[in-house]
């Protein structure tokens, strides 16, 4: 079924920055996708095209990317007359039109908007939900797997004030009997955490960050983990609710001396307290003994390969590569060869097309890695990643706290999918690391 119209415009993301929205029309109607954007971005990811005109949107405009859809990608794709159900052919066509290694010419944000809108049109033409279409494209087996929602309830690092260096502390309801129950456990724990934070750190500690987590004036990871453990206990889930961290350590790595500065937000940070990777690894090991931590993302900097491989040998928890791999097939291959991690953080806008995202997941699965599908800190009401996580059987999703509509939009979509699939779906639960094999 041919595409009759493709039109892009700019809309705003959850941080008030412009982003790209693409409308695509076929005989089945209008299919729309909005592209997200990240705050702490890895230097190896696909190019998000921004205008750089400081007189508008502080340089973050996307008029050029929008124009690239309206004058190049759209017209050329319509002219090519490709079948919207053939996602691979469409994405290869878009990649070829751009012609650069990391989509610098037309912008990954322009290309991804078109790619995701095409996927929605393809699903509509087949008369199936998007997750079913993604499942066909990825060739995943049935039953469907519903993901464990990793809920980012406490923020530090670049996402918050206070001296806390680690960026995200997540609660993980892997022992829940279903997705909906896991989400309920998370919401109840989040409410307990919020009231504890206000009690201990004052009213403003209840304010939420970009992803809906609270950001009290906390100094150390231990202090954060104590507070979360207390909230879990108050909610009645001690022993059942697990914890995960995204350290985002590239943000506080001192490349010149190859050390990690946990006091990086203090301009007078004392270099004698900076840690070698062995010392930082020992700190993580201590924390995992003390608290029910099941997953650590970006424990080391994005090019500190030696540290990753060292830590990998000593740990059996999930080690998630985000800045290290940025969903890039070449980086993923290297991480697998160097035995640096055992799970991939999949962000569709880091690579720029649905086909490449699916391939990144498959490459990771092939080596026994887990895959966690992720939102970005600049999100929108678009829920495509909810369908992707179910379609590729990833078994884990990270999409913020159970707060702020752009985060809940994804979680609510998975609730709908759970209801629709009924007994044709299983909850990944404790098997979230190997859900693709369930």
UniProtKB/Swiss-Prot annotation:
This is Enolase. Transmembrane segments: none annotated. Belongs to the enolase family. GO terms for biological process: glycolytic process. Homodimer. Substrate binds at residues 159, 168, 297, 322, 374-377, 398. The keyword Cytoplasm applies.
């Amino acid at each position: 079924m041919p595409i009759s119209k493709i039109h892009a415009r700019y809309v705003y993301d959850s941080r008030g920055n412009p982003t790209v929205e693409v409308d695509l029309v076929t005989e089945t109607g209008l299919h729309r996708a909005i592209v997200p954007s990240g705050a702490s971005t890895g230097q190896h990811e696909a190019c998000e095209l921004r205008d750089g005109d400081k007189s508008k949107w502080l340089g973050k405009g996307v008029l050029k990317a929008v124009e690239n859809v309206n004058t190049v990608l759209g017209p050329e794709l319509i002219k090519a007359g490709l079948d919207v159900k053939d996602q691979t052919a469409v994405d290869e066509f878009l990649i070829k039109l751009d012609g650069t290694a990391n989509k610098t010419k037309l912008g990954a944000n322009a290309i991804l908007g078109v790619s995701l809108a095409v996927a929605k049109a393809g699903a509509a033409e087949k008369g199936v939900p998007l997750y079913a279409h993604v499942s066909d494209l990825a060739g995943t087996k049935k039953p469907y797997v519903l993901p464990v929602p990793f809920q980012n309830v406490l923020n530090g690092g670049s996402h918050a004030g206070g001296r806390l260096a680690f960026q995200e502390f997540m609660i993980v309801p892997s022992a829940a009997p279903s997705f909906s129950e896991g989400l309920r456990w998370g919401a109840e724990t989040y409410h307990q955490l919020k009231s504890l934070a206000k009690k201990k750190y004052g009213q403003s500690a209840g304010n939420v960050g970009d992803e809906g987590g609270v950001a009290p004036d906390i100094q150390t990871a231990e202090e954060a983990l104590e507070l979360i453990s207390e909230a879990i206990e108050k909610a009645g889930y001690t022993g059942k609710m697990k914890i995960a961290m995204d350290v985002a350590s590239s943000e506080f790595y001192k490349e010149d001396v190859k050390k990690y500065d946990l006091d990086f937000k203090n301009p007078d940070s004392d270099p004698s307290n900076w840690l070698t990777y062995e010392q930082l690894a020992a700190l993580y090991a201590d924390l995992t003994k003390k608290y029910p931590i099941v997953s650590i993302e970006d424990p080391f900097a994005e090019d500190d390969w030696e540290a990753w491989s060292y830590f990998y040998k000593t740990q059996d928890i999930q080690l998630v590569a985000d800045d290290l791999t940025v969903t890039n097939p070449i980086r993923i291959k290297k991480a697998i060869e160097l035995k640096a991690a055992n799970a991939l953080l999949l962000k569709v806008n880091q690579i720029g097309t649905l086909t490449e995202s699916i391939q990144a997941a498959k490459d990771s699965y092939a080596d026994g890695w887990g895959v966690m599908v992720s939102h970005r800190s600049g999100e929108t009401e678009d829920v495509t990643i909810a369908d992707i996580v179910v379609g590729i059987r990833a078994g884990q999703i990270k999409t913020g706290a159970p707060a702020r509509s752009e985060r809940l939009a994804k979680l609510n979509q998975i609730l709908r999918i759970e209801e629709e699939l009924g007994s044709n779906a299983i909850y990944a639960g404790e098997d979230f690391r190997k859900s693709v094999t369930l």
